[in-house]
Amino acid sequence: MCLILFAVNPNSRYRLIVAANRDELYARPTQIAGFWESLPDLLAGRDENMGGTWLGVNKKGAFAAVTNFMETPPDPLPPRSRGDLPIGFLTSDSDPNAYLDRVSARGNAYKGFNLIVSNRDKCSYYGNRAGAPRELEKGYYGLSNQILDCDWPKVFDGRAKLMEIISAFDDPGEALFSLLLEQGDDRKFSSSFIAADTYGTRATSVVLIGTDGNLLFEERNFGVNGIPLASNRFQFNCDVGF
């Protein structure tokens, strides 16, 4: 059960704030976040099974992330990988709305997913189980493996805590990581962080994109039973270039 908590234009300092957990089988081969040799403008982790990603940015300050949509029973496996969807946006200069319109035209070629894409001007959302693409207004949002802003406790409570953190901290990074590590209570879908022996939270990520062009991407990785592993931190100004 992945989690993405994010704020669109929350204040004069930031145009996008993201706190995200990727939950996956520990046995699934994964590369930790970094710039890709084959796509040098792309900064993201990589799923080695299918070659895609779950969350990333590019050097121009665009952002994209995807989650699976939980379905019972699961749909038969279509030919396209959902992890290609963030890459398609981050390796283009597409307008977010235009990109999601193109994706929605072939949405039935994928298993259920939610996709967030953002550039300097706008942030937009599309889920192929959630209706038409839409541009997101200024505000605070939560996404897991259901529709945007569903009533799951970790989404509902997480969004409220995201608002509190952004109001309280000029630099919210560490507070966001603490939020992502919360293990919830007895309610179903309440745990942000999952620590188990075969499946759990593999990566926690914080992305801060400032109105001044400064971009921070930090990823912390975890193994079986939530044991901390590697961490990576990247910071650059997407207005200056490389």
Across the structure, where does each feature detected by a protein language model lie?
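N-terminal nucleophile
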Residues: 1-242
